[in-house]
Amino acid sequence: MIIYREENEIIKKALENLNIPDRVYIFDTTLRDGEQTPGVSLTPEEKIDIAIKLDDLGVDVIEAGFPVSSLGEQEAIKKICSLNLDAEICGLARAVKKDIDVAIDCGVDRIHTFIATSPLHRKYKLKKSKEEIIDIAVDAIEYIKEHGIRVEFSAEDATRTEIDYLIEVYKKAVDAGADIINVPDTVGVMIPRAMYYLINELKKEIKVPISVHCHNDFGLAVANSLAAVEAGAEQVHCTINGLGERGGNAALEEVVMSLMSIYGVKTNIKTQKLYEISQLVSKYTEIKVQPNKAIVGENAFAHESGIHAHGVLAHALTYEPIPPELVGQKRKIILGKHTGTHAIEAKLKELGIEVGKDINKDQFDEIVKRIKALGDKGKRVTDRDVEAIVEDVVGKLAKKDRVVELEQIAVMTGNRVIPTASVALKIEEEIKKSSAIGVGPVDAAVKAIQKAIGEKIKLKEYHINAITGGTDALAEVIVTLEGYGREITTKAASEDIVRASVEAVIDGINKILAKREK
């Protein structure tokens, strides 16, 4: 695996002389802060399943929830604690005896206790003095330690607290027995330079491990978490997919892969499982992962641009920072209007179709033309679209062998109009026109074609499949025609159902007539 701190001269120089730890501990709070995402409510069974998967992923600490919040929460946390997972199980508790007692009763390994320290919270929420807040924090920590449980202490809204007072609070917390102190950027107001400064100042005074909990209100949660690590923070709070209140929290997958691939910092995470757990959490929370989400989004390793796709096919690192397999993803060449011939040829090969072997150059050119035409209509071309186009192109007779060609078609339909179709066919250099009515536009068009060529060829079966979703889906029409003692099945694909139907019928007619000639 490439480590940019070693390979990239700019990064290497920028990180010189920094106090970056060799190993960072991952504290996952998906089941607590992640569940506080508006609209998310996990059942105890879902929380247990996610906890098992988080443990399998390799997180060091699982914050299983806020025990005092509900009986269901307590039930889930107790069950998680009984599973004997490798991860340390943590419960959140305000610096209040009632909260702490409920957390202790759940059997957690660690209690994450907190009290707000910023001027805003002191004045408007707590209505307490600086000294009173320190006393409350110390009492809570000492009470937890009396029960032999590890303590993580957070000064809520730390990043809007006066720095001298913040240092005093944390020092008193450590003196009371806190095993680790956590610095929450509660409303995400930090910038990386400021976060580095704050953690660096705390490291001078605090002799226990320092953790950070960054919110993403300005889109800086991951950047601030990494800045904290640059200053020496040993633990980072994260959530899967960056879930959390308001703008969310630092995304675990982004933090971990940045630490490993850019900084060369070790974590215990099995990165190949990142995509899998991202999908699981998305399923249970019913919050879709945005396609362009780093690391786990569907487009994270997808390429459409001809230049990019060609580069990736030549050497993956030209347009990818890490191999997709490293996070459980797969590289995707997305076909559309920007796609070049190299990418389309590679996609065909992926689908088991080789140019020069399974299709000729003319057929390949037609396939490219049709794929780009779909892309021009704003459509994302799927593998099934490609297969349908290939089947349609390959299944058609060469132009020189075709007896019937469609010159023109016009269809009229409506709620007060009888469906009517008019066609002009070129049959052995002669133009024949006909019109017909039907129970629908497709029926009218097929009847008009049959009328133009005579009654010797009949439509026996007609099937239509929507290959992809949406009102502009590519439709595949399959028809079975009978004529001259022969039965032929053909297919055609188009976004226009009438057009696909007409092309399938005409292709079938040509095949019957070609066999008749032979």
From Swiss-Prot:
Pyruvate carboxyltransferase domain span: 24-275
InterPro entries in alphabetical order: 2-IPM_HCS-like (IPR050073), 2-isopropylmalate_synth_dimer (IPR013709), AIPM/Hcit_synth_CS (IPR002034), Aldolase_TIM (IPR013785), LEU1_arch (IPR011830), LeuA/HCS_post-cat (IPR054691), LeuA_allosteric_dom_sf (IPR036230), PYR_CT (IPR000891)
Keyword Transferase among UniProt keywords: yes
Pathway: Amino-acid biosynthesis; L-leucine biosynthesis; L-leucine from 3-methyl-2-oxobutanoate: step 1/4
GO annotation terms (biological process): coenzyme B biosynthetic process; L-leucine biosynthetic process
Alphabetically ordered keywords of this record: Amino-acid biosynthesis, Branched-chain amino acid biosynthesis, Leucine biosynthesis, Metal-binding, Transferase
SUPFAM superfamilies associated with the record: 2-isopropylmalate synthase LeuA, allosteric (dimerisation) domain (SSF110921), Aldolase (SSF51569)
GO MF assignments: 2-isopropylmalate synthase activity; metal ion binding
Keyword Metal-binding tagged: yes
SMART domains: LeuA_dimer (SM00917)
E.C. designation(s): 2.3.3.13
Root EC class: transferase
Catalytic activity, reaction form: 3-methyl-2-oxobutanoate + acetyl-CoA + H2O = (2S)-2-isopropylmalate + CoA + H(+)
Record: residues binding a divalent metal cation: 33, 213, 215, 249
Cofactor: a divalent metal cation
Described purpose of this protein according to its UniProt entry: Catalyzes the condensation of the acetyl group of acetyl-CoA with 3-methyl-2-oxobutanoate (2-oxoisovalerate) to form 3-carboxy-3-hydroxy-4-methylpentanoate (2-isopropylmalate).
Complexes and interactors: Homodimer.
The family this protein is said to belong to: Belongs to the alpha-IPM synthase/homocitrate synthase family.
Name recorded for this polypeptide: 2-isopropylmalate synthase
This protein's encoding gene: leuA
